[in-house]
Every structure is written in structure tokens, then in C-alpha cells.
Amino acid sequence: MRSLNYVQRVSLDFTGTLFPHAICLGDADNDSLNELVVGDTSGKLLVYKYDDSKPFITRICVGMLTCVAIGDVCNKGKNFVVAVGAEGWFHLFDLTATCKADSASQHESLFSEDQRPLFTQHIPANTKVILISDIDGDGRCELVVGYTDRVVRAFRWEEPSDASDVGSGQLVLLKNGFWKGRWIVCRLTQQDSSGSEEDTPATPGSEGPSRDVILHLTTGRIHNKNVSTHLIGSISKGSKEESSKCGLFALCTLDGTLKLMDSSEQLLWSVQVDHQLFALQKLDVTGDGREEVVACAWDGQTYIIDHNRSVVRFQFDENVNAFCAGQYTCKEGKNSPCLVYVSFSHKIYIYWKVELERMESTNLLRVLDKKQEFKSHLKALGVDAEDSAAVKTLVANLLYKNEQV
């Protein structure tokens, strides 16, 4: 297992406390660049943009926020920000127009009319996690809400036929959108075989045909029914042809177990680590279209594992309150892979441009042999590129004996 050390990071100011699912990455203001959205226990919704340490946008919600999400929950072809509190208050924000405003004015007008939600509604309380996705294949997104009592409910945004604005609609509980018991419900989205490119995370219209995987975790199939389990689906396999065959999903447990499975419940690999894993994400760190599994422990130890079970790890230097991973626009004016850590010292750290040339370990000589520039240097030095022993000796002398050539 290799260890990594990422150094490109920014520090954001955050003085509140938050629940693990009250943080997400996505295009909150529909400018094609991703932002970081955080909800705290005092009811504040904060949106961070670029490398600015202060929130670009601040909104006030009712109660303590337990989960936030970004997506086209109203099926309008653009993203909305959703924040749900423990008391059951659902808040809907349209931040599209906000990107045109000056960030300084946002800080000054904290309690103006513009700071209020576009829509609020009370739904059953004790929410734990939310998901915006098309769960019934009708091309419209639904809001799936998981509760602390193991109940899952699905809602759809409905509007009157003569509605003039988004705020005139409401969430309606689906007739068959209620599940109860020790179940894990995962959304596996297959790539569209028509050849359309997959959009960045939280972009409207990015999901193709999909299927549900429901695992009933009976006592005989889990190590300990009291151990917290986290699941993530829709893990991209790279090419659209491969991804359309079956989806991948991963799960991790607080006792340090990591597993990758396909939609037929076939186990692809299992990894056991000596850390308490509390967060599970997916992220393409190699740029090949395949998403790696990213798991984070309370002590900051972070594991990145590919589909072939190649593992690298990164140690964040503080204990972690919350964690997420995805695409974020920090610098350079474009989205890049990033890891986000919320510490207990009133800071949020974003490691941006989290990229690797490859996941698996490799031989240096094999890598050099594929580079034409290296062969040109060998020829200039009078070393036969086909003489592997001579090449090996030359490289060893340069690396370990510091000899001049």
C-alpha cells in the first residue's frame, strides 16, 4: 500500500458544527463550475466558491440542518440547492441569479429578502441523508430521504398546471415511496449507450437508464448488525459499453471493512483496514473515466482504491468531523478532483487537483522505455536502448550513486 502526500490545498473559515451529510459539492449557481455547500447545526447554509476563505453565499434555514444536496429536484433543467433539517423542514434555494451579484454585497445583506428560501415545506422529521435521482426511470428526478429510524421515503415535486413560478409547487410523497426495515437502497446509474458524454457531478440530465439494487442485510450476512454501514453506487467503470452491462457499488463499515460489488451482488474485492471508516465517496483521480472508491476514517486516514484493488492512502493531519470528495473549482477556472475535510478547529480544508498518473505500482524502467525522449538521451550517451542491463546500470548510478553522465 503506497502513501501519498498532497500539498495543493486551501483553507476555508467555518465556525459552526455540522452533521456528516450536511456537506456536498456541485454546481449550485448553474455556472458550470462546482461549489462547496455546507449546512450547520444553527441553520446556516453556506456556499463556498473558488479559493475564497469566506462563504460566497449565506442563507438562513429553520432548525439544525442534517443534510444538503444539489440537483434538479424541480425538473426545470437546472440545479437547485436543497437543505433539510432534523425537525423536518425542507428548504429549496435557487442560486442561479446569485452568481451575478457581487460577493461583498452577499455578506452585507444577510437578512434581506434575497436570503430567504424559494420554498419551504414540512416533511417527517429526523432526516439523516437525502438523494436527488430518477428512481423510477420516468426521466424526472425524485427526492429520496433516509431517516434515523431506518425509514426511506421518496417525494416528487409537483406543480399546478397554471403555475407561474417554481415556488407554487410542493413535495408529494410517492404512493410506493416508503420502505422500512434494515435495508440498504442504492442507486446504480448505467451509462447511456447512445454515446452522449457524461456530465460533471450534480449537472442536470447527466444520468442515463438506471436500475435499483436492494440488499436485505440479514444477520447472517453482516459481521455486526450494530456497526454503521455506508454505501455508494453509480461507480463509473470507464467506457460506456462496460458501464452499461452492470453498475458497481461499494460499501464500508465502521469496523474497517471495504467492499466493491456489482449489481448481481458478486464481490469483486474486499479490504480490511485498521481504521474506523465513517465516509465513503467516489472520485476519478486518474482521469481515465473510472471512478475510484474513496473512504475516510475519523483520524484523517483516507484510502483510495481502484477496481483492481490497488490501494493508496493519504493521511490528513487532523481528526475529521465530516468528509466529501468530488469535483470543485478552486483555481485555474475549471473543475478538478478534490478531497474536502471538515476539522474540529473551525476550518475546512480542500485538497484540489487530486490526481494520479496511475493507481497501480509499476517499474520505473518500463515507464521510461515508453518515452521517446528517454531513448534519445540513451542514444546521445552511447547506450543501447535494447541492452536492458546497461540501461538498468545507468539509471541506478544516476539515482543512487549520483554519478555525472
Walk through the language-model features, giving the residues of each.
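Beta-propeller-forming repeat regions
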Residues: 1-405
